[in-house]
Amino acid sequence: MKKFKNLLKQYKLDGYIIPKNDEYFNEYVNSAKDRLKFISNFSGSAGFAIILKNKNYLFVDGRYTIQAQIQSGKSFKVITIPKKFPKDVLKFNKKLTIGFDPKLHTESKLNFLFNIKNISLKSVNKNLVDVVWSKRPKKLIKPFYSLSKKNTGISSEEKILEVKKFFNKNKVDYLLVTAPENIAWILNIRGHDSKFSPIPNARLLMNKNGDIHFFTNPKKITMIKKSLTKKIIFHEENKIEKILTNLYKNKIFLDSLSCSIYYKNLLKKKNIIVEKIDPIHFFKSIKNITEIKNMKKSHLSDGAALTKFLFWIKKNFRKRKITELFAQKKLENFRKMNKSYKFPSFNTISGSGPNTAIIHYRASPKTNRSLRKGDLYLVDSGGQYSFGTTDVTRTISLDNNTKLDSNYSNRRR
């Protein structure tokens, strides 16, 4: 933290914003990109920090207030949104210059949070956390993989033709796709870039003719290159800056919710920008017959694993010691019996007794309770399958508690 605050002086800043998200605005970021956890020790899925010269603030929503206070310790003052916003704590008589990394913020969100009279925002292209993060975890690179029409119902070529109609209606020259989940949809590919979601970290630039420039690490495309349309031109991740800079007098559509300030600034110098929600969100939301069948299939598969697990709990909790963490692992093992299972869809909530009342509780060696007679046991979990995603919450009574207790606990979820 001392090194970081020295950088504030070096860059003539009064403070610096550190968000949870990575450059792709993913909810779940890998350890090599979790700058907020590195600086604050907070491991929740949402939040941001403001580091000032003499004080540090950690902003989270109500799900994470207790967790943030425990993990960040005395180094940070935890602020719960929406009870308070940055404008409520940055009330100083003097003007403050607050720095930010333009690749980690959208204009709309930054303006919403920091449209404050005494605050001057300063874009800093070098990420200051990265400068002081010497023992950074290694970034694992795994190749993307393709989904067959059996799982998607519609080929990538058909999806591209559908999106092409959007160009004609809106009279734009290019569509910049910056949301990884939308790239996954249009190209029928998946990846390993997020711990709980099979999204591919990449960017895509499509023109009105259906030609696509695809930007990502070359090591990630080895398994998908042959299966994709020949209209796709593959580029290294960092080549996007050069290609965007060279676009001139074009009408370019971008999503203000997922396009960073950095890329927007590259484009708006020489082009006309149209900022709306990425049309792929709309196309993606209309599920075809195959997708609907696969959704049902994924819940039947997951339901079988969960049913076996709950039966196992009821049968064994009196006979042997079952802790929250052991139960969590056992559920994962039941899911793994299905060959189509990939990995969890989020951090499992496995809580017993008083821990069921903690929002977004995550069992740890320190909090790991044994399941006891008379407890309520709550499990909120999900799985990623090759054909769908699940998210299921169940509360069971371990003996004497009534149905009413279970209803109350489920409502808290």
Language-model regions, residue ranges each:
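Active-site neighborhoods and metal-handling regions in enzymes and metal-associated proteins
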Residues: 1-413
